């Protein structure tokens, strides 16, 4: 019996060692409590901290990279402008100094009118390239035509409506003159010429043009001294009216022209019928046509809310006032754009040999990068470091197209 007791104790210890490791010493009740704690229900939670979950990736990694590209582009623009203007640093000219210097400068409005400054104007979706083949329109002559019946009362006035093609309406008008032929007078006389803008008659309109139906809006009035017994061609500046017509083509219903002498005789030749050949009123325009033609943009264009991950062109407006660069007179801001996105093999690659090199040695060559493949200049009017006003053209400041290279 003495030998049997140690032997029995050994068997009991061996049985304890052979039990499953996950089973607690207290039996099934303890195992159930441990399972409940692991599931997070019932009982007291374990004081041991749970292992932290790995951080989730950013919700929009493309957006983070895009913001990084924007910041790099802005810094690059700053350095490029200073470098291309041969300035070591931005001129120290405050807004107050600019206000003091501008009135003493030569008239700047002529420069601002003659040269295009890219500002808040919207840029076309398709990029533009220089067109060296098509002719540039310089002078446009528009002959008077019959007015629309909607502006006539008892068939009057028949003259004058001027039609302009969309091509002309998108040019820069440098000068606009309305030419009217005045009949000869037997003796020197003072003639009062007036130009009235026409508009359709309303429901309350009457033949007298009173009330809500009035169709005459005086836009020009001239006093002319005639001394010749022969006819006289009179020119009238019409640039301002033309600008309003081009901005709102639906407002161009035509004009009525009158030139009365002291006796009340209308000397203006406005008849479009026989006997007035070559004497009809006409409009002469001096325009500066944009010598660029639209071409299909082969690159992708995206906005800031796009989920596109491929190489794409994004809008970016550079605000010089936000930089504190008051030394730039014009433009105060411009649309620079920037490129961002991934470049997979054979996606929008600029050069075919790039793909061949990467295929031949994929490990030894860097992948293609999303970069500008077409850029255009901007015009700039600015103060240099000597407080002189300079006009210049800065190349390569607007991204027109992006691609992989």
Swiss-Prot record:
Propeptide: 21-296
Disulfide cross-links: 302-312, 311-370, 339-402, 343-404
PROSITE patterns assigned to the protein according to its UniProt record, in alphabetical order: TGF_BETA_1 (PS00250), TGF_BETA_2 (PS51362)
One Pfam assignment: TGFb_propeptide
Keyword field contains Secreted: yes
Cleavable signal peptide: 1-20
Entry GO MF terms: cytokine activity; growth factor activity
Keywords carried by this UniProt record: Cleavage on pair of basic residues, Cytokine, Disulfide bond, Glycoprotein, Growth factor, Secreted, Signal
Compartments where found: Secreted
Glycosylation: residue positions: 92
Effect of substituting residue 120 to A: Inhibits processing of prodomain
Tissue specificity as recorded in UniProt: Highly expressed in the developing limb bud, initially detected in the distal mesenchyme, and later localizing to regions around the developing bones. Is also expressed in adult dental pulp and brain.
Cellular compartments per GO CC: extracellular space; protein-containing complex
Residue(s) at site: Cleavage: 119-120, 296
An individual GO BP term: ureteric bud development
Description of post-translational modifications: Synthesized as large precursor molecule that undergoes proteolytic cleavage by furin-like proteases. This produces an inactive form consisting of the mature C-terminal portion non-covalently bound to its cleaved N-terminal propeptide. Activation of the mature form requires additional cleavage of the propeptide by a tolloid-like metalloproteinase.
CDD domains hit by this protein: TGF_beta_GDF8
Reported consequences of knocking out the gene: Deficient mice die neonatally showing altered patterning of the axial skeleton and impaired renal, palate, stomach, spleen and pancreatic development.
Primary location group: secreted
Assigned protein family: Belongs to the TGF-beta family.
Quaternary state and interactors: Homodimer; disulfide-linked. Interacts directly with ACVR2B. Interacts directly with ACVR2A. Interacts with ACVR1B, TGFBR1 and ACVR1C in an ACVR2B-dependent manner. Interacts with FST isoform 2/FS288.
Annotated function: Secreted signal that acts globally to regulate anterior/posterior axial patterning during development. May play critical roles in patterning both mesodermal and neural tissues. It is required for proper vertebral patterning and orofacial development. Signals through activin receptors type-2, ACVR2A and ACVR2B, and activin receptors type-1, ACVR1B, ACVR1C and TGFBR1 leading to the phosphorylation of SMAD2 and SMAD3.
Official protein name in the record: Growth/differentiation factor 11
Origin species: Mus musculus (Mouse)
């Amino acid at each position: 019996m003495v030998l049997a007791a140690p032997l029995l104790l050994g068997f009991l210890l061996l049985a304890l060692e052979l039990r499953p490791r996950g089973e607690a010493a207290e039996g099934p009740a303890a195992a159930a409590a441990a399972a409940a704690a692991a599931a997070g229900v019932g009982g007291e939670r374990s004081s041991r901290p749970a292992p932290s979950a790995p951080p989730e990736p950013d919700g929009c990694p493309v957006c983070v990279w895009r913001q990084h590209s924007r910041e790099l582009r802005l810094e690059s623009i700053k350095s490029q402008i200073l470098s291309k203007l041969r300035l070591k640093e931005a001129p120290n000219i405050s807004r107050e100094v600019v206000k003091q210097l501008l009135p003493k400068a030569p008239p700047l409005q002529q420069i601002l009118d003659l040269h295009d400054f890219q500002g808040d104007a919207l840029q076309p979706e398709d990029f533009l390239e220089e067109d060296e083949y098509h002719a540039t329109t310089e002078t446009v002559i528009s002959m008077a035509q019959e007015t629309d019946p909607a502006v006539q009362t008892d068939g009057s006035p028949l003259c004058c409506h001027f039609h302009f093609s969309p091509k002309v309406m998108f040019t820069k008008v440098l000068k606009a003159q309305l030419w009217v032929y005045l009949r000869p007078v037997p003796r020197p006389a003072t003639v009062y010429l007036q130009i009235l803008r026409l508009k359709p008659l309303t429901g309350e309109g009457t033949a007298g043009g009173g009330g809500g139906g009035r169709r005459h809006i005086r836009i020009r009035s001239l006093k002319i001294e005639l001394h010749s017994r022969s006819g006289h061609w009179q020119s009238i500046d019409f640039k301002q009216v033309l600008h309003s017509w081009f901005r709102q083509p639906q407002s161009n219903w035509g004009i009525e022209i009158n030139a009365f002498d002291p006796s009340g005789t209308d000397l203006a030749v406005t008849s479009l019928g026989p006997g007035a050949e070559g004497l009809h009123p006409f409009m002469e325009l001096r325009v500066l046509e944009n010598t660029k033609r639209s071409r299909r943009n082969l690159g992708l264009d995206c906005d800031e809310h796009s989920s596109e991950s491929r190489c794409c062109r994004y809008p970016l407006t550079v605000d010089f006032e936000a930089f504190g660069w008051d030394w730039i007179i014009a433009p105060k801001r411009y649309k620079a754009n920037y490129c961002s996105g991934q470049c997979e093999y054979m996606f929008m690659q600029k050069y075919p040999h790039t793909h061949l090199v990467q295929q031949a040695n994929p490990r030894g060559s860097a992948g293609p990068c999303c970069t500008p493949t077409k850029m255009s200049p901007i015009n700039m009017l600015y103060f240099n470091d000597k407080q002189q006003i300079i006009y210049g053209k800065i190349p390569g400041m607007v991204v027109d197209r992006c691609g992989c290279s």
